[in-house]
Swiss-Prot record:
This is Uncharacterized transporter y4wD. To R.meliloti MosC. It is a multi-pass membrane protein. Could be involved in a transport system. It is found in: Cell membrane. It holds the Pfam family MFS_1. Its main location: membrane. One of its GO terms (cellular component) is plasma membrane. PROSITE patterns: MFS. InterPro entries: MFS, MFS_dom, MFS_trans_sf, MFS_Transporter. One of its GO terms (molecular function) is transmembrane transporter activity. The keyword Transmembrane applies. Keywords: Cell membrane, Membrane, Plasmid, Transmembrane, Transmembrane helix, Transport.
């Protein structure tokens, strides 16, 4: 058992690191906006740079993971990733903040691809499903990052101090686990670019489900703290509670998701997930108090936790399109929504209200419940 747990710990450390740094950033968004006096629309453009950095990194890191080995790439990315979170706190001007966000997004996307590739190797080595446990570790990291942000704001810690301390501490605690012994599979690519395929009708509907989930997750990450601060009127420290509750709920649901799918089936779990997300967003939109709105974010977390894993599993089982291309096609919907969704919300929030923005996200969440039958395998 110890022999099997050793590689698991290494991958889990990579997921934890990714989640902690994203949660750390998300929890201090209102502070960064206030420091630079940035309007929501302008900040949406900055968030777009973060997402674009991640999207650009996906194909690059995928090829590097194949040619160099996923574990080696994860180790190579770890230090620049830690440096990038520190740079976000130290950036003195908006242009430098934009550059730091783009680099932070690239490091986040690169680490995401590398540790998922590494996780698939370890899962095969262990001989049983463990992927959900790794994604749960990402959510644990996000909760820890958000909790750190809450503590930092309570004690009025400057953003640059908070981010620097986080980078040094997390690097020291998790770095050794990334160095645990593991030999990744090395693959060679044939000449020519690896392209995506246009999804068939079934995969297109799966893609819409992934889009709805990606939009919800991206909105919670980038705008939950702003919503609580600006709409509900909470203190900056309490604004971190929304994403903390969202992430904590995702942890618990992801730890249970595999057993629920075995018992009820993919479609039923997806349908219940969609209803949970819709109800949670209604609480957020209609709620006027901190406990009620945080409860809404918790239900959002429960609702979105299992959706993307179910969508990718359905894509991999497609009878027409090969698994790799099918997953890549569906991933474009999810990551495109995570990238463009927060940007669009920033623009819409300037023209309308944040409540309307979240209501629209809820309409997309309803698609998950409606389209759930397409996830049957």
């Amino acid at each position: 058992m110890r022999r099997l747990l050793t590689p698991w710990r290494g991958v889990a450390a990579g997921f934890l690191l990714n989640g902690i740094l994203l949660g750390t950033w998300a929890s201090r968004v209102p502070a960064v906006m206030g420091h630079f006096h940035v309007a929501k629309a302008s900040f949406g453009v900055l968030l777009l740079l973060l997402g674009l950095g991640a999207l650009i990194s996906f194909p690059i890191t995928g090829r590097l993971s194949d040619s160099l080995g996923a574990v080696r790439v994860a180790r190579m990315i770890a230090i620049p990733f830690l440096v990038s979170i520190a740079a976000l706190g130290l950036a003195p001007t908006i242009p430098l903040l934009a550059i730091a966000l783009f680099l932070f997004g690239m490091c986040h996307g690169s680490m995401d691809v590398a540790v998922n590739s590494w996780a698939s190797e370890v899962e095969k080595h262990m001989g049983r499903p463990v992927m959900s446990s790794f994604h749960a570790m990402w959510s644990v990291g996000a909760v820890l990052g958000a909790a750190g942000g809450y503590i930092a704001t309570v004690f009025q810690t400057p953003v640059y101090v908070h981010f620097l301390v986080t980078a040094v501490t997390i690097g020291g605690l998790l770095g050794p686990f990334l160095l645990l012994d593991w030999q990744s599979t090395i693959r060679t690519h044939e000449s020519g670019a690896v392209g995506l395929v246009l999804p068939n009708s079934g995969l297109f509907l799966v893609g819409l489900i992934a889009l709805a989930s990606g939009l919800g997750e991206g909105t919670a990450l980038d705008w939950s703290a702003v919503y609580l601060h600006d709409v509900v009127g909470t203190e900056e420290s309490d604004a971190a509670l929304g994403y903390m509750g969202f992430s904590a709920a995702m942890v618990m649901m992801r730890l249970k998701a595999d057993s629920l799918v075995t018992r009820w089936g993919s479609a039923t779990v997806a349908r219940i997930s969609g209803f949970s997300a819709v109800f949670g967003i209604l609480l957020i939109v209609l709620g006027e108090t901190l406990p009620l709105v945080v409860a809404g974010f918790v239900l959002m977390g429960v609702g979105y936790a299992a959706v993307l894993p179910l969508a990718f599993s359905r894509a991999a089982a497609d009878l027409v399109v090969p698994a790799g291309k099918a997953i890549a096609s569906v991933a474009i919907f999810a990551y495109g929504a995570m990238t463009l969704g927060p940007f669009a919300i920033g623009l819409l929030a300037e023209a309308a209200t944040m409540r309307l923005c979240f209501f629209i996200v809820g309409l997309f969440a309803a698609l998950v419940a409606v389209l759930a039958p397409v996830l049957k395998q």
